Regions:
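Nucleotide-sugar donor-binding/catalytic module of glycosyltransferases
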Residues: 1-226
């Protein structure tokens, strides 16, 4: 990671790719703004034809030290992630889709942990932080949490040879992961444009570059299923 970017003092960059998201963008962004200390939010307006871009600009004006906006022609979800990663100043990087949101209490604990790691020497920081995520069927009033407590030791950094065996429902997905930004740069991550399921590439391509892992047993990410 570029040394000058680390000196910006941002601990976490959250990139939110947005396309025609005016009906739910507020829920997403408001969940992120609960933790502004050390946080950078990059809203990537991917050529929206509704008021998404205007809403994003309103947040940037209201929170100029936290929120940045990118307006670009439509390139798909992967293109939005790429745009956010190129501008990221945070030591850590996470993607949150615009129709999803983060749990307030879990996000507070995550940011507390990340702020601690960001104050330590680079060689002592985890390359990857893993949290639980929740499938939210809002219309049906049903939720299903995917947790990793049987796989990773808690409250310590571990390596791959210290974790358990994954069940078919416990594969690592984008929603569960917070990468050190330098890992994403080192692996040369660039997602294809106009392509479905690029979140699988985001989750898996950097893993060979990950050595140190920290598991936070919190239901952080809410994945909206309409």
């Amino acid at each position: 990671m570029d040394i000058d970017r680390e000196k910006e003092g941002k601990c976490l960059t959250v990139t939110v790719p947005c396309y025609n998201s005016e009906s739910y963008l507020e829920r997403c962004v408001e969940s992120l703004l609960k933790e502004r200390d050390g946080l950078e939010i990059i809203l990537v307006d991917d050529g929206s034809t509704d008021r998404t871009g205007q809403l994003a600009d309103q947040y940037a004006r209201a929170y100029p030290d936290v929120v940045r906006v990118v307006h670009k022609k439509n390139g798909g979800h992967g293109s939005g992630v790429n745009a956010g990663l190129m501008l990221a100043n945070g030591i850590y990087f996470k993607v949150v889709d615009s129709d999803d949101w983060l749990d307030e209490a879990a996000f507070h604990k995550l940011m507390s942990v990340l702020r601690f790691w960001c104050r330590t020497k680079e060689e002592k920081r985890p390359d990857l932080v893993v949290c639980n995520y929740v499938y939210d069927h809002l219309e049906e009033g049903k939720t299903k949490a995917v947790r990793y407590g049987n796989l990773f030791p808690e409250q310590k950094i571990c390596r791959w040879d210290e974790i358990g065996c994954f069940s078919p429902e416990q594969y690592l997905v984008m929603h569960a992961l917070i990468f050190r930004t330098g890992v994403l740069y080192n692996c040369g991550l660039k997602l294809p444009e106009h392509t479905f399921y690029v979140d699988n590439l985001f989750a898996n391509c950097p893993l060979p570059f990950v050595q140190r892992i920290y598991y936070l047993n919190e239901d952080l990410y809410h994945y909206y299923l309409g």
